[in-house]
UniProtKB/Swiss-Prot annotation:
InterPro entries: EXS_C, PHO1, PHO1_SPX, SPX_dom. Residues 180-193 have a biased composition (Low complexity). This is Phosphate transporter PHO1-1. The keyword Transport applies. Induction: By Pi deficiency in roots. The keyword Cell membrane applies. It is a multi-pass membrane protein.
Length: 799
């Protein structure tokens, strides 16, 4: 059976860890008390009941904790434990509650407590009181935050239903197509008044506090003339694009849709230009009010509906976390008080638990009421009354891990090892990896296999990262915003790696066998590459389709970096590509080799010596750094944080270092060598500073952990120092360009492959500390759920 302390650590909300009861610290106080009691012959036992469920495996879903045991235990307690808010003067302790700005509990040890342990008992209850007060304060603050969010969402829902109703009425009056509205939102009937057939949008440019938002504002006719004057002057806010939508009852309603994609940005700009060129026909909603009425854009309403739906899901998740927080803390108080009774022999559970039961975090039912209300609203308006469908969004189930996956991992690993050993023996006998002038194999086939090897080595390192993050309770699924229940588990990643490498090495073995016998088999590596590309783009629901499509979306966002809003997973993946420059160059060469038809004649010189092809290869070396720099520029544009410009400078320095390397390869003069050393050394220092200080959060001079940071997830500090040293050594891999190491008769391409593999390993090592720092930042702000921006904002007409 699993001890409660391990269950407690494994099932708490990772980002709220410091707000939970410090159960381990209270246990240490009890051990000190045990030392005080033991000389007097008191029988000590600290065993815990084993009536708990086993520890859940997923870090990303702590709210899935099974609370049936907790409720059963609390129901078994005597009724006298509940309901009193007054101090209890019976037994070994007295618990008093002071009410001021908040509840504060203080416990006094009575003379009945033995004098030999009175000091330790007072220290224990002082710490226990502090924990209870901390839990109360945090619970109340989070509850108020969620209640405020719930109130805002109620207003958002009312506005959405009203606009959907007006849109439906307008469409039925003009196009006789009210049935085209979204059936998932129930609409109430509303009267629009007399309307004109030329009803259309009125566009304006406005400034808002939210970056990159598309805004819809309802204004009176007098405001429209001033607004058009601003548009004619060409003033367009850097932060937002404005769209005006009028209504009879809502005169100043802003619909803020984030411009996260190029389509939304282009659509907003097109609407602005169209409204500048076309006259604005006015229609009366009410002859006395004189308000301009316009139709409601259904596309904007769909985006708004999606945003509100996401906000409800995040609110429900947060309320679930808050319920978990309450029940786990209640269980912790019960367990630690039982342990105290066993150590001291004094009956204190009934007295102290009475105070805990009446405290705010346990007695308040507002969160549960709001949770039920959110569930009801979601079922009615976003699931068409289908509760099961709604629960798939609100409480997504985690995929069960199968032992079948583990079996196939072992099977594929065995196949890979056997085939790889056979391939190495055959390649050694054939002398394929020695320095030979007539080695067509190294020029034509080896780039394909080295490219796949680097790719799946990187994927394997990511699987190792997932194992380490899970063990360290780093909530990587929340950081990357992966869809709950659909993200890959580490076993899935290892299965993909082992199966793919077994296939690749098998093809390598077959190709080498044919090549040694003199058969023309140059098309085999090309078919292997084509097969993987077809599998990547396969539209059928097979071989992790959701993950493959998400990967393609991320690549699209990276390639068009300035046009898409940058999120964590996008720039994290772009950082991975910065470590895969050799793989990208191999991909470019292989594409040229097979597209140009050189594989038929084995004339590989075209893709090496042709000037424009060679220049393209150099451009590929710059691409990952360019994409990452553009992401920094977009983040600075969105957030106005100059730190992103400093980060952009790091990638510019990397591009300069790559350019110096290209210049040295073309002209191996002393001047080119000096330029390479100076630029590469400066870029390396820049990158090391950013790695240690910004990405890892280390090298803090005033930290309680010398030159590290205050909060560390790993227990051993020496690991952090060793990791910094390892990162420093691996960052200096560019020196091989200057030193030209020679390992006997081994081909230089094999040496380059090993150096590229070391960079991939460095990146995998870097990934762990990067996400550790991100997780600690979230934990420092107690950020366990996403804050989804809300689409509708009502403003005063004067604004």
């Amino acid at each position: 059976m699993v001890k409660f302390s391990k269950q407690f650590e494994g099932q708490l909300v990772p980002e709220w860890k410091h707000a939970f009861v410090d159960y381990s610290l209270l246990k240490k106080d009890l051990k000190r008390m045990q030392h005080d009691y033991s000389p007097q012959g008191t029988i000590i036992t600290t065993s815990t009941p084993h009536d708990h469920h086993q520890q859940q495996q997923s870090v990303a879903a702590p709210s899935s904790y099974n609370l049936s045991h907790c409720r059963l235990l609390l129901h078994k307690l005597p009724a006298a434990f509940f309901g009193s808010n007054n101090a209890d003067h019976a037994g070994a302790i007295q618990v008093r509650r002071r009410v001021g700005r908040g509840e504060v509990y203080e416990t006094e040890v009575t003379p009945e407590m033995e004098t030999t342990a009175a000091t330790a008992a007072r220290e224990f209850f002082a710490r226990l009181d502090a924990q209870l007060n901390k839990v109360n304060h945090f619970y109340k603050a989070k509850e108020e935050e969620f209640l405020h969010r719930g109130h805002s969402l109620r207003k958002q829902m009312d506005i959405l239903l009203d606009l959907k109703s007006r849109s439906s009425s307008s469409l039925s009056g003009h196009h006789r197509a009210a049935a085209g509205d979204d059936p998932s939102i129930s609409s109430s009937s509303a009267t629009s008044g007399a309307e004109d057939e030329s009803t259309r949008y009125v566009t304006s440019a406005t400034d808002t506090d939210e970056s990159q938002h598309e805004t819809a504002v309802m204004r009176d006719p007098e405001e429209l003339s001033a607004e058009q004057g601003l548009e004619d002057s060409g003033s367009l806010s850097r932060q937002s694009l404005g769209r005006t939508v009028s209504s009879c009852q809502r005169k100043n309603l802003k619909i803020n849709i984030p411009l996260t994609t190029p389509c939304r940005t282009i659509s907003a700009l097109t609407d602005l230009l169209r409204d500048d060129l076309v006259s604005q026909p006015k229609n009366k909603c009410d002859s006395d009010a004189g308000i301009t009425f316009t139709t409601i854009n259904k596309t904007k309403l769909r985006h708004a509906e999606k945003m509100i739906k996401g906000a409800f899901i995040e609110l429900y998740k947060g309320l679930g976390y808050l319920t978990t927080y309450r029940n786990l803390n209640m269980m912790a108080f019960v367990k630690i008080l039982k342990k105290f009774e066993k150590v001291s022999g004094k009956q204190v559970l009934s007295v102290y638990l009475r105070a805990v039961e009446s405290s705010y975090f346990n007695s308040s039912g507002e969160a549960l009421k709001l949770m039920d209300e959110v569930e009801d609203v979601f079922v009615r308006h976003f699931a068409a009354g289908n509760r099961r469908k709604a629960m798939k969004y609100l409480k997504p189930t985690q995929r069960k891990e199968s032992h079948t996956v583990t079996f196939f991992i072992g099977l594929m690993t065995g196949c890979f090892v056997a085939l790889f050993l056979g391939y190495c023996i055959m390649a050694h006998i054939a002398g394929m990896y020695t320095q030979r002038r007539d080695s067509i194999y190294m020029e034509t086939v080896y780039p394909v296999f080295s490219m796949f090897s680097l790719m799946f080595l990187h994927l394997f390192m990511y699987g190792c990262n997932m194992v380490a993050w899970r063990k360290a309770r780093i909530n990587y699924s929340f950081i990357f915003e992966f869809a709950a229940g659909r993200e890959l588990k580490y076993r899935d990643v290892f299965l993909v790696c082992t199966a793919s490498m077994a296939v690749i090495v098998g093809v390598m073995f077959a190709h080498l066998s044919l090549a040694v016998r003199g058969f023309h088999a140059q098309a085999i590596p090309g078919f292997l590459l084509l097969g993987f590309l077809l599998l990547l783009f396969c539209p059928f629901n097979m071989v992790y389709r959701s993950t493959r499509f998400q990967f393609l979306r991320i690549l699209r966002n990276i390639v068009f970096s300035p046009l898409y809003k940058v999120v964590m997973v996008d720039f994290f993946m772009a950082d991975q590509l910065c470590s895969q420059v050799p793989m990208l160059r191999s991909l470019e060469y292989v594409a040229c080799y097979y597209i140009s038809g050189s594989y038929r004649t084995q004339e590989y010189g075209y893709c090496i010596n042709t000037k424009h092809i060679r220049d393209l290869a150099y451009a590929v070396s710059f691409l990952p750094y360019y994409w990452r720099a553009m992401q920094c520029a977009r983040r600075w544009f969105d957030e106005s944080d100059t730190g992103h410009l400093v980060n952009l400078g790091k990638y510019v320095s990397a591009m300069l270092a790559a350019g110096a390397k290209v210049a040295y390869e073309k002209d191996r003069s002393l001047g080119s060598l000096s330029l390479l050393v100076i630029v590469s050394s400066s870029a390396t220092m820049y990158q090391l500073y950013w790695d240690f200080v910004k990405d890892w959060g280390l090298l803090q001079p005033n930290s309680k952990n010398p030159w590290l940071r205050n909060d560390l997830i790993l227990k051993s500090k020496s690991i952090y120092y060793l990791s910094m040293g390892l990162n420093l050594v691996l960052r200096l891999a560019w020196l091989q360009t200057v030193i030209h190491p020679n390992f006997g008769s081994l081909d230089s391409r094999v040496t380059s492959f090993f150096l590229a593999a070391l960079e991939v390993i460095r990146r995998g090592h870097w990934n762990f500390y990067r996400l550790e720092n991100e997780h600690l930042n979230n934990a420092g702000k107690f950020r366990a759920v996403k804050t989804v921006p809300l689409p509708f904002h009502e403003a005063d007409e004067e604004d």
